[in-house]
Structure formats: C-alpha cells, structure tokens
C-alpha cells in the first residue's frame, strides 16, 4: 500500500495512482506516482511543473543490475535514438547505482524524485545516491518507462494514471 502523500524536499505531492508490476504471474514490485495535482494522461504528467516522485517497493527479491538494465531498455524503447543518445551518461550512471546494490529484497524501496532547481534524485533503501541528474529530460525519460508508448506493464501504466482497474 502506497502512502496517500509524500514530501519531496519540502514540496507536498499526492498519490496520483499506484499498482503492481507483474512479470509472468509474479508481482515484482509495487509502484506509486506522486504529483502536485492529479493527472490522467502521460502528457499531463510530463508537462506538469513542480516536484514529482515514483516510489517503488519490491515485492520479491530482484537482481539490481538486471533492474538497471531493464530501466535502460525501458528508457530506450520509449524515446527516439538521438534523445536517448544524449542521456547515455545518465543512463550509465543509473545502471551503476543499481548494480552497486547487488540485489533488492522484498520490502526494500527506492524513489526517483524530480526536485525543481536540483534535478533527479535517486534514493535506494532511504539513502540518496550520488549527485542529482540535472537534465529535466532524464526524469521524463525515466517516467516513460512506466508511462510511455511501450510501458513496462500496461496495467501498471493505467493504475499510475489513476484509471480504475479493468
């Protein structure tokens, strides 16, 4: 269960939607999308100013380097080649962050926050990981993993956008 609201470096954000990521028949993680106000489309989410958060709680053990690779692939699948190539240094650093953790166990969390004026802050198990990613496009590219035209999980995309389960 995701909290109804969160604090992103002093900015209050509310739960827009939450759901589980399935791989085959297994729930892999639960994710929540937090925004300054409700949004029902990917375009609204990407265009919305202010702090934003994706919060993920693992529901089973996962290999962190595999998670990093899936993030990279999810970003690449949801943007054109030239946009992706500009973000490669950030993508490499993101993969590095996850591979340093070896694995994430059930119940462990990570957050990806957009902090206006600071950038994207990745927090794993409650600890901020290195310097913020400065480019706004990087956070939006991460969001597209879940909300883009080729989402990680269609049902999760609908849930994060606050749509009732079918």
Where are these regions (language model features)?
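N-terminal secretory signal peptides
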Residues: 1-48
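Mid-length scaffold segments of soluble, non-membrane domains
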Residues: 39-117
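Flexible glycine-rich active-site/ligand-binding loops centered on an Asp-His dyad
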Residues: 129-156
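Short strand-turn-strand beta-turns centered on an Asx-Gly dipeptide
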Residues: 124-128
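Short, intrinsically disordered, mixed-charge
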Residues: 73-80, 144-148, 161-162
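Cysteine/selenocysteine-centered motifs that mediate thiol-based redox chemistry or coordinate metal-sulfur cofactors
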Residues: 155-166
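Short aromatic-centered micro-motifs
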Residues: 6, 121-123
